[in-house]
Amino acid sequence: VRLRIIDGGASTSFWMTFGGGDPVLVSADGLDVVPVEKNKTFIGIAETYDFIVTIPEEGKIEFRITAQDGSGTASAFLGNGNMLPAPIVPRPDKIGMMQKMAKMDMKMGAHALKYRPKKDERYKMKEEYGMQMDKMQGMNMDNSEKKDDAMPKMDHTKMQGMEMKKDSTQHDKMQDMNMDGMNMAMPKDTMKMETMAGMKLQGMDLFSEYNYDYLKSPQKTNYDKDVPVKEILLNLTGNMNRYIWSMNGVPLSEADKIKINNREVTRIIFNNLTMMHHPMHLHGHFFRVINENGDYSPLKHTVNVPPMQQVTIEFYGNEGDEYGDWFFHCHILYHMMGGMARVVSYDTPRDPRMYGYPVSNLVAETNKYYTWGMVDVASHTTALNVISSNIRNQFNVSFEYGWNKNLEAEATYEYYLHDYLRVFGGVNIENETRKSLDQFKTTAVVGVRYLTPYLFALDARIDNELRPRIGLGRSIMLFPRFSVFGYYEYQIDLGIVNNLPVNKDFTSETVWSAGAEYFLSRNISLMGSYDNRFGGGGGLSVRF
């Protein structure tokens, strides 16, 4: 029987395994490939694979899918009788993966939200983050999009320090090298760019089983060498803290269309600078996924880009029906909605059928405001925090009231300059006299907030009475359901606006608190804390 498997999930990719003999993989994304016996196969979101499965006269074959993170499995059975079990894919060794990563020379933290989104820093970003190729001094990074179909030049003497696995240095293995983005002068007959997708450097095999080298097209898929090539580098970037996803540090809402035309080959290099897989899908097209099969690289409509890896695709819009705008996105739903998408636009009039569906509506879907909050109800204090935010803009409202009638409330607006830094302004209200609600002081505040290394939340501000204040807070998850937190705040009044007490050069105020929280469920926690304004106590925290 022919079994077609489609990953229709929103956020989960799977490993597929079969009981009995190895099935024959015959199609990928609906297009034929050279048949190959393959049992354990990875399927990304939106991908499709067809297998020829031979059902025995006696016994039933288990077809088993395992979530990529090992969190769950499901099975279907083909045939009757005793079960022929499918191989079990073990859970990933997360500790082992982290140990391997610790040995790699790579810099994490590429911005998902750049300070200057219109500035082209693609190649600088690629060079700075991810796997550090310090010894590849001959790499030539051109900040313009390349339209040259010839192989650029590279000084071979600069590759003396490159560390490779021993078998990859042999001359007869050179066809497996992946030099995407490197400029290398080699005779065209000796090495074609399309055949260099398989090179693995020392320490880069952490995700080596995620590749498409087993897929080979039955016919040649390469394009005429005289057709010009436009090369586009897309660094895949993301921020798990705020869940912003983008390309080249620019989410869809701040990006220009990718302009292409049907008179040239469009070559897109995906460079994944995140620790998540990204199944990239281009509407309305099949593209070549460059692998070790060179001219016979397969055609697909979705390609999975593993963490810290690079994948190259090509397409040539010369069929006559490629025109207008096409959506191009990560098929993990939450990544797409977080901004990891683009609009690919041919230099043709827009499809008249789309006039009632402006692109701006699509873009707005990826830049919605989301609102959430938390209420603390405890024996010594009551607090409320509400946040409403889209990609760049955020509104905050906070309120604290203690059993001893100490009250403070604040409303601010902040703007994210990049992932970790934002500027803000707002209004702060607090009672002037402790243990009395008769009089309140209202001040205007401006400042910056910064998420420091090691995830400390820094707040530096000054109010309209020219009193500077600095605050620093941190929450640490010690166990799956248990966290501790702390906050320190110091404000000083130098008497620039206010009159100081006699014989005082300044006055100051210190606020600090510390506590712990146990998560009963996703939305409710037990908490206990001590605050130098309110004292100690305990209660419930409710998230909404």
Listing of model-derived features with the role each one plays in the protein:
Residues 1, 6-7, 87-276, 286:
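Edge beta-strand plus adjacent loop/short-helix module at the start
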Residues 1-18, 44-67, 219-238, 253-282, ...:
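Beta-strand cores of secreted/periplasmic/IMS beta-sandwich domains, seen most often
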Residues 1-124, 293-304:
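Histidine- and aromatic-rich segments of cupredoxin/plastocyanin-like copper-binding domains
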Residues 234, 363-382, 388-399, 494, ...:
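Transmembrane beta-strand segments of Gram-negative outer membrane beta-barrel proteins
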Residues 375-379, 397-401, 425-429, 460-464, ...:
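Transmembrane beta-barrel strands of outer-membrane/channel proteins
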Residues 377, 388-390, 413-415, 448-450, ...:
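Residue-level signature of outer-membrane beta-barrel architecture
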Residues 382, 391-396, 419-425, 452-458, ...:
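Repeated loop/turn-to-beta-strand initiation elements of outer-membrane beta-barrel proteins
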Residues 446, 514, 533-544:
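Outer-membrane beta-barrel "beta-signal"
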